[in-house]
Amino acid sequence: MLRVYLTPKERFRQAGGSRLKAAFSGRPLYQEIVNRAKRAGLVNAVAHHTHYGFSNHGHVQVREVEGMNSELTMCVEMIGPKATLEDFCRAHGDLLTDKVMVYKHLERWKLGMTAPGRAELTEADVSTIEDLDSE
């Protein structure tokens, strides 16, 4: 699993596009990251907005009652094998440069009933897309 931290106000800029144009016409960067993750074949990509917190030793921020606080850090979480996530980062450095990114090792857990009232938990490391497929 890879988490990329950014703010909702960050915009996607086309190559050669200006910041001013991106600020008024570009879509949010988190949407572009999720869209590219889908095209790259990752298993899951979700943008999580936060409600309360701080980043980089800054001030505590709160989500506004009427809408979103554009300064409050959010996270795009992507799930896939480590090698696939590494390839994604290399291929999309234009979106991810200077972002805080955190990789976490994944295990797939399966819970099955072995007898009435008795559950068995099995764990398996995730190293391929097939390891994540649902049954």
Residue ranges and their predicted role:
Residues M1-E135:
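Positively charged, small/polar-rich N-terminal and surface patches that mediate targeting and assembly
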